[in-house]
Amino acid sequence: MSQGSAPFWETTPLAQMSQAQWESLCDGCGRCCLHKLEDEDTGEIYHTAVACRLLDLETCRCSDYAHRKQRVPDCIQLTPADIPAFHWLPPSCAYRRVAEGRGLAPWHPLVSGDPDSVHRAGVSVRGRVVSEDEGDPLETRIVVWPGRDV
């Protein structure tokens, strides 16, 4: 970014971003990789502290990103076409923030220049979740914090 020019997330609509720009918006918090439950009657989404088995609980990144859809068929791959449905993403999510015109948070790696800032700010799931491989019933692991803005 040259001095005086606005960053791409402030000038380029989500639907017009390059693949590299789109991917770089992910802050690496891991919240979208947590299992969620939906109330059949109200449609309300409940977050759990149970992560997809492919989520590396230390780095908060997918351990097999290139093949995640083959290994986890119900993995949700975010694309610009999904923008109208971003309401299920945590309010802190960069995709949702940009879609809502709120810009990136100060702790976002694109703003801070530090990929670990998301962890230091307490936004990531690091140290707060278990893998689905532990076998706990999701209903026993419902938590509120992933759905809160930070």
Swiss-Prot record:
A Pfam family that the UniProt record links to this protein: CxxCxxCC
Family designation: Belongs to the UPF0260 family.
HAMAP family found in the cross-reference section: UPF0260
Protein name (record): UPF0260 protein Tgr7_0887
